[in-house]
Amino acid sequence: MVAIPRVAAARSLARQLARQSLRTTSFASAPVRIAIASTPLARSPSSFRSLSSSTRRSAAAAAAAAAAKATPAHDDSHTPMAVLTEADLGRLVRQRNVGISAHIDSGKTTLTERVLFYTGRIKDIHEVRGRDAVGAKMDHMELEREKGITIQSAATYCSWKATPPTEKASVSGDAANVESKELMEKKQDFHINIIDTPGHVDFTIEVERALRVLDGAVLVLCAVSGVQSQTITVDRQMRRYSVPRISFINKMDRAGANPWRVIGQIRNKLKMPAAAVQIPIGAEDDFNGVIDLIRWKAVYNEGHKGIDIRETDEIPAEYLELAKQKRAELIEQLAEVDDEMTEMFIEEREPTIEELAAAIRRTTIRCQFSPVFLGSAIKNKGVQAMLDGVCSYLPNPAEVPATAMDMSSAATKKAAEEAAQAAGEDQEAAAEARKNAAPPVLPLSPASEAPLVGLAFKLEEGKYGQLTYMRVYQGTLKRGNLIFNARTGKKVKVPRLVRMHSNDMEDVDEIGAGEICAMFGVECSSGDTFTDGTTQLSMTSMFVPEPVISLAITPEGKESQNFSRALNRFQKEDPTFRVHVDKESNETIISGMGELHLEIYVERMRREYNVPCTTGKPRVAFRETIEKKATFAYTHKKQTGGAGQFGRVMGYIEPMEVDPETGVDTAFDNRVVGGSIPNGYISACEKGFYDALEKGALSGHAVTGVRFVLEDGAAHSVDSSELAFRLATAGAFREAYQKANPVILEPKMTVEVVAPIEFQGAVIGALNQRKGTISDTEVREDEFTLTAEVSLNDMFGYSSQLRGLTQGKGEFSMEYKCHTPVMMNIQKEMHEAYRKKQTEKK
């Protein structure tokens, strides 16, 4: 085997420092699932003994912390039962919920097609773009097969007999892992739920809601292009929901394939510690197989479409030194993020296969490391090993913490009182704390007998009505059961329950905790929580980005009911697709994440609803904001004979940063004390503030990034009303807005261009003409990748220009980054145009 690399200097001092660090480091940061009433570890002493001593300490500490956190927040009547039975454990440890995500054209759907073939879910392999008149199974929409891209995420499930990292027992080392030695001594059947997601940034909401409900992910990267713009977006989404991932470097057969450069990009661009668990045997056209660095075997795909695996202990001589070097690198990377591996490294002790595999699993589940697999999906190589990695290193549903807010009146009241007490004797602070107190958060357990808790994460219009995709986090969902929508309070019967296999369905009678399913006939919205009615729990929904582009749409001929029906359906399915009617022009305006996003919906209206439409020129989603604080003291007073209108408000507005978790960037803050404004008028003030945000004074676009603080005011016993205070607040905002240095914001895009090296100068020149700022350039043998920041308003027509500049050989992608102030000359032009337009109306 391979010798551990020696530490350079000061060996004895390094040992002392490392041991001191080990003694003071806590393992409680590892994701640990604890059952409240009875932990699986407490009821499985044999499994508990099989864990390392440090893991036992970690489990005990985590159990105590979880109990301490859960107990005071709520009373026993609101505590969900969370007893995991042996049957639950046996089912959960062999289950994985994973998503396959990547930049566009990295080979996600091609990879998923091979996964379905090797697991026996499909009888033959079909390619993307419908080259064989069939098309990939997961791209079931006609538009997807025509364009060769995934537009909607698609769910499926399969079973896989996984080869463990070692033929001997593999102890996980994670407190929540209850997989016994017997389980790992031979191949075991794993049940895998898979969601194949789009790679185009315009459909990023599909990735967002998939990752919200998944326990792990496969991040696919191209061996040539490496980390690209959408790869960075997907990485950010995975971090938002703490989703562990393994990495799969695809297209190892392509000219210019360089997995080591890609691994370097994972570490440097994504800031994720990573190392290969395989090295390639050959490259490009000669890519032949891989060497497993953990089991120390050469692995080859043979037989019909690579279905047979041949393994040998004979490592090709020309790859032996590289294999030793990369295995040492793997150990070094793990030693940087795992304390047990650090201790072995310092002591110069070679880890066993079991210890190495356990360290990979431990650090992967903690989102501290990503093992990297290699292969070529199109050449049917390396896919089975990646599947083994999914089963070996990604968590089961019991190992991923899930929580829900207790919205019961008793729990929320108790939380409010505790927050008020913590604020001290200051009555104003106590009232504010009571108002802003968050509901208590309870841990969920994937126990089949626990009260049902599930999250609806995706809606589709099916042949038999609305199809609602749901992840069951706790309890059991059964066909015919009554379930309760936590948002609306309505109860509904589940008439039909199915498992999805792309667009095919398999009827089932029940779905257990940790599973993904779909329901027919259940009206709801994306992000709704469902329970069995015995609890009042609600889960947090997913992050929804704001649209960045709009266009006017008009049906050809007479407007029909189908036009409205299509728009309503698309809005319900896709939270990033928005529709409104412009009050001035009376035009129907659709908004989305990009030109392709809106183009797809316009085409779907024609095909699915027989409503051809004409569209106007795309409009950029400009916004307005303020740059400094400004005070207001505004009185709305109107006398018309009889009861008049009177309302006085005082306070200030100030800039507000966007909340990275929720995306919220506007807020109304009531700090009125003493009843100077009666409580009944406060909600009217809030409505007036949000009325004023709809149109800014500079360009008529929506105002964002503002906090409105209401401090004082006055009311009249006869003339004051809700309308008076609503108008007073809107007037106060407009008055303060002019003093707060308002600016117009425009969407800034991160643009990535890939083209042959001979066109580099022309591409850079074109982006400079569009006022782009180049942030990164990477040159390879015969092509280059250029990253720049360009205003969306300057990107219209770029696709045609790039084709002309590169003779059709260049391609680009762009992703929304942020809104930034426009240049002052542009702001003046936009302001003058808006003023002129307003004057003409009068």
From Swiss-Prot:
Annotated source species: Mycosarcoma maydis
GO molecular function per UniProt: GTP binding; GTPase activity; translation elongation factor activity
Any single GO CC term annotated in Swiss-Prot or TrEMBL for this entry: mitochondrion
KW Signal (keyword) present: no
SUPFAM superfamilies with a match to the protein in the record: EF-G C-terminal domain-like, P-loop containing nucleoside triphosphate hydrolases, Ribosomal protein S5 domain 2-like, Translation proteins
Family from the record: Belongs to the TRAFAC class translation factor GTPase superfamily. Classic translation factor GTPase family. EF-G/EF-2 subfamily.
The protein's name: Elongation factor G, mitochondrial
Cell compartments where the protein resides: Mitochondrion
Region of interest (Disordered), ranges: 423-442
Positions contributing to GTP binding: 102-109, 196-200, 250-253
Function summary: Mitochondrial GTPase that catalyzes the GTP-dependent ribosomal translocation step during translation elongation. During this step, the ribosome changes from the pre-translocational (PRE) to the post-translocational (POST) state as the newly formed A-site-bound peptidyl-tRNA and P-site-bound deacylated tRNA move to the P and E sites, respectively. Catalyzes the coordinated movement of the two tRNA molecules, the mRNA and conformational changes in the ribosome.
Entry keyword annotation includes Plastid: no
Keywords: Elongation factor, GTP-binding, Mitochondrion, Nucleotide-binding, Protein biosynthesis, Transit peptide
Pathway as given in its UniProt record: Protein biosynthesis; polypeptide chain elongation
Positions of the tr-type G domain: 93-398
NCBIfam families: small_GTP
Biological process annotations from GO: mitochondrial translational elongation
Targeting presequence: 1-58
